[in-house]
Amino acid sequence: NIELIFGISPGFVSESIDQTTLNNKIQAIFDLGIKSLCILFDDISFEATKQKGKEHAEILNKVSQDFPEIKLYIVPQIYSDQLSKTDVKDCLYLNELFSRIKYKVPFFWTGENVVSKSYDLEYISKIQERFNQELIIWDNFFASDYCEPRVTIDVYNPFVKNPKNICGVMINPTGKVNLDILLLELFSFGMGKGNEDFKSILKKHLPNEMIDILHYFKFEGRIGDVDKDIEIIDKVLWNSSMEIKIELYPYLHFLRFVLKNKPDLKYLLDKRLRLKS
């Protein structure tokens, strides 16, 4: 079953949020037949204060009241431990927000970091209990919008055991069709629902030569034998005819340029692309 959730970002441009304008937009998508909506308060530049928590709760309550047929979700302005200046359970914004929400509104959470590799399910459960709303993990493991042209192709195994006590897990993919099909299979395998193992999935979707340079695609990548890796990258670029190659072009060309020219890009490689020599 597929549930289409439409996202709206009120407050992204202006600190004040016009409820009438917001409701008009919601009515427009509701008229199109969309019955699930997520209010996105993430990435707002204004400080996440206690007052902002109150305002965001009032907006959610008004939307829930005016559109009872719509299933409502929220990405709070603080959506990760990393973004909170205090322990999350003591965060003034979050406590004010969730204490004032009068309806059941599941919220998205990215874990300890905005881009998390794994999750402490016991801790996640405590956050869920603290705020008395269902929690959905927003997983950025495979995401690339913040580090283009970097591509992550790695084993997805963020849970020690099946996360039964949370509402769900949503992965944030890349928007590249063939690559996302591969990543969805890796996600399914990591959740214990796939029939193929990691290597079988890779062989089905990637040129054979790619397997030998996967260290550049790991979540925590590394630089290998530069001369040998340049040769392999050239083979993938010029000899492979698989459709997914087009979606990997930007990263492969970037790697080829950096490895061949060896500029002083330590900050870019380490901090931006997570590649350590």
Question: How should these model regions be labeled?
Answer:
Residues L4, S9-S16, K25, L179-L183, ...:
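Contiguous hydrophobic segments
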Residues M191-S277:
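C-terminal functional modules
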Residues N1-I70:
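Substrate-binding cleft of carbohydrate-active enzyme catalytic domains
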Residues Q27, D31, F107, Y156, ...:
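Generic preference for hydrophobic/aromatic residues in regular secondary structure cores
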Residues I44-S188:
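Catalytic-core regions of glycoside hydrolase
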